[in-house]
């Protein structure tokens, strides 16, 4: 079995995990910028057209056929809806996209849609607003209080996130962010609604946790992994310690059954001082949390390979040890 990772970025560890899981019975390929070290760690790589280029999908299909690649796993939020729209086209060529259905990618990438989904599922997200007038009305009625968080509606990697402490900061940073979005990769998805491309949320006090919800390839709930976040870097978990997932399982099962995502779902949440679990964001892909789960004895790559090969769920691969603290090391390399 040969597997391709699109937009592999800095996730060299994912390449290594899958190489180890294949146990010599296949190769791992990657695509991204030529300046990405991860490419040098894969068994092969390609430089594809940009994701919104009309030649992107035909290029990937031809590359997969040439290299006998039978599964693609995207690692970047922008890739997800583009690939999901073409799921059937890949399937006709015998290539499995390990990606959620298109509506799921829209719910996860659009933080306003995430908020609405969580409310409908009976869960507790932070109070969230789409316009300045609605936010100011909520402030005037004491429904929310400063500090607030202003961030892109279609955001990723902590790009353009601001904490505001008063009305003056809110107005200034809202305007600044609305301008800045168009100078980043966020402009592509934000073009879906240029006037309402920012959300404003109540700042949440409490301890931040990360949970990963694993569904099988038929979108059925399989497992939950959890960790306490100790430090962050560039929007990714940098230091974390695995914790007992039991308190998070009811929420994970609710999300799984309502969302029906495929494979991994990366979820950020807080436990408030009163003990309430507040769900913040979701990403329907391998996220920056996964190395901490892997270090705690879980082997999702091996399980995915078994599923892709027609095998059953092996719960011994999905049993997380608690109390395992890990960090991500920065190690300069020549490539």
Predicted regions, residues:
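ATP-binding N-terminal substructure of ATP-dependent carboxylate-amine bond-forming enzymes
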Residues: 1-99
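A conserved helix-loop-beta module that forms one wall/lid of the active-site cleft
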Residues: 92-160, 179-187
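Conserved ATP-binding module of the ATP-grasp superfamily
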Residues: 124-125, 167-204
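Glycine-rich phosphate-binding loop of ATP-grasp-fold ATP-dependent ligases
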Residues: 125-128, 148-177, 208-210, 230-241
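Peripheral (often C-terminal) accessory segments that flank ATP-dependent C-N-forming ligase machineries
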Residues: 138, 302-335
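Beta-strand scaffold of nucleotide-dependent catalytic cores
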Residues: 162, 172-174, 198-202, 208-228, ...
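A long amphipathic alpha-helix within ATP-dependent nucleotide-binding catalytic cores
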Residues: 232-279, 283, 308
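ATP-dependent carboxylate-activation loops
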Residues: 238-242, 287-303
